[in-house]
């Protein structure tokens, strides 16, 4: 079976999508490799990402110099958690994969908002990825859930309206309650 077949096909008709934000730390030993070796390893890694990108959305971001626990992040959006796991396995089998260690991994799922049907998450749009992304796990307080639903809905509508004032910002809210330690992942 080829790597393309193992990763599988993305179905665009599914309404359930899974999101994975994987941050990777690069072993300092990587810097000691010769330039030709690093270049070949980078080509191998990028080739793998290109193949996987035909089966799911993958967005890559550099965190170099911005975080001390990661040099890059992969944001995967797929109709299957297994596709993400296959890609992770394949990453670790590459030359570069021998020099990376995951520092943080967040898993979440898409779901229609309880509060508004006016929001289409940025990841669901057929647009190229933005140059920058801010990713953060979010936990709502117990007090939030004790508020009446209509009050929460109104506050969320106000929040959405503020976001609409900045069309260059895309909202990406996904749900991780019961999957991970946070209620939501925001990007």
PLM features: residue spans?
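Short S/T/G/P-rich N-terminal loop/turn motif that feeds into the first structured element of a domain
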Residues: 1-53, 81-84, 103-165, 177-181
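A structural feature that tracks compact, well-ordered secondary-structure segments
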Residues: 24, 63, 73-79, 88-90, ...
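Short connector loops at helix/strand junctions that flank enzyme active sites
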Residues: 67-71, 100-102, 131
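A common structural junction motif
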Residues: 91-99
């Amino acid at each position: 079976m080829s790597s393309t077949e193992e990763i599988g096909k993305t179905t665009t008709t599914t309404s359930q999508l899974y999101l994975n934000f994987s941050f990777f730390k690069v072993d300092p030993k990587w810097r000691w490799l010769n330039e030709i070796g690093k270049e070949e390893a980078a080509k191998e890694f990028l080739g793998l990402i290109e193949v996987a990108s035909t089966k799911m959305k993958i967005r890559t971001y550099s965190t170099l110099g911005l975080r001390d626990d990661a040099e890059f992040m992969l944001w995967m959006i797929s109709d299957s958690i297994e596709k993400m796991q296959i890609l992770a396995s394949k990453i670790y089998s590459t030359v570069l994969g021998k020099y990376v260690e995951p520092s943080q991994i967040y898993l979440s799922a898409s779901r229609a908002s309880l509060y508004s049907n006016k929001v289409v998450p940025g990841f669901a749009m057929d647009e190229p990825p933005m140059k920058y992304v801010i990713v953060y796990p979010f936990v709502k307080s117990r007090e939030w859930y004790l508020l009446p639903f209509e009050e929460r809905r109104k506050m969320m509508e106000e929040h959405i309206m503020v976001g609409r004032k900045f069309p260059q910002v895309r909202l990406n809210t996904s749900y991780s309650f019961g999957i991970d330690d946070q209620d939501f992942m925001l990007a």
